[in-house]
Amino acid sequence: MKMMNGEDATDQMIKESFFITHGNPILTVEDTHPLRPFFETWREKIFSKKPKAILIISGHWETVKPTVNAVHINDTIHDFDDYPAAMYLFKYPAPGAPELARKVEEILKKSGFETAETDEKRGLDHGAWVPLMLMYPEADIPVCQLSVQPHLDGTYHYNLGRALAPLKNDGVLIIGSGSATHPLDETPHYFDGVAPWAAAFDSWLRKALINGRFEEVNIYETKAPNWKLAHPFPEHFYPLHVVLGAAGEKWKAELIHSSWDHGTLCHGSYKFTSA
């Protein structure tokens, strides 16, 4: 990936990074899903600049070591079962970004993540292509995807994001795609508004982010109420930590979407703008 200079660099520079809740993949065929209008009006209401490339961190790609896909055309991975047949026909043939992938690998290795590697076969899982299909339906922006390491902690993923922050200067949009809460499937649904345990976690997260208390988010296991219910497994939370790191040293957080599914699954999504 070529570095830019002068006016080109200034024009391409991106100050924002985003954490989005990608939601249930059923939203691809369910027009009334609350995330549909959020994603479909992304360029109109949230981020109008066209990035040079997108680096997306999805909670649906779990690996032992940080891995980034390096392909020329992204395959569409239908990594879900027992959904309407039409959903398995969707394709999001966004071009890959192999030069960016190699740059990511290089940066990570130089930043202490010596085991970082590329994957030359993997496409985009639904944590990536489902929101991107609605946000950028033309599929004309190069995309590469970065994995999470669920056996490690929030601080590790924050530091990984810090290493990648300079990519924004080259016009790379960094998006973390996970979920503000991601309870187990067997967690009882709450039909009278929002489950109190989920509301308490969401309130803590919102206040911590808006007030810049990223250290608390990094060690959420000792700070957050009901975290074991909200994130019994961390893979859908760690994309947020990567994006927090990518925001840099000084940033401002803004809640850009909030809705709920079953009163337990929070669709909270945030923009982080660097100073």
Curated annotation (Swiss-Prot):
GO molecular function: ferrous iron binding; stizolobate synthase activity; zinc ion binding
Pathway: Pigment biosynthesis; betalain biosynthesis
InterPro entries: Extradiol_dOase_DODA, Xdiol_dOase_suB
UniProt keyword terms in alphabetical order: Dioxygenase, Metal-binding, Oxidoreductase, Zinc
Protein origin, superkingdom: Eukaryota
One Pfam assignment: LigB
Reactions accelerated catalytically: L-dopa + O2 = 4-(L-alanin-3-yl)-2-hydroxy-cis,cis-muconate 6-semialdehyde + H(+)
Gene3D superfamilies: LigB-like (3.40.830.10)
Sites where the protein binds Zn(2+): H22, H60, H182, H236
CDD domains for the chain: 45_DOPA_Dioxygenase
Cofactor: Zn(2+)
Enzyme Commission identifier(s): 1.13.11.29
Induction trigger: Regulated by MYB1.
Cofactor binding comment, as recorded: Binds 1 zinc ion per subunit.
Record PANTHER family: 4,5-DOPA DIOXYGENASE EXTRADIOL-LIKE PROTEIN (PTHR30096:SF0)
Family stated for the protein in its record: Belongs to the DODA-type extradiol aromatic ring-opening dioxygenase family.
Function recorded in the entry: Opens the cyclic ring of dihydroxy-phenylalanine (DOPA) between carbons 4 and 5, thus producing an unstable seco-DOPA that rearranges nonenzymatically to betalamic acid.
Protein name, as recorded: 4,5-DOPA dioxygenase extradiol 1
Organismal lineage: Eukaryota, Viridiplantae, Streptophyta, Embryophyta, Tracheophyta
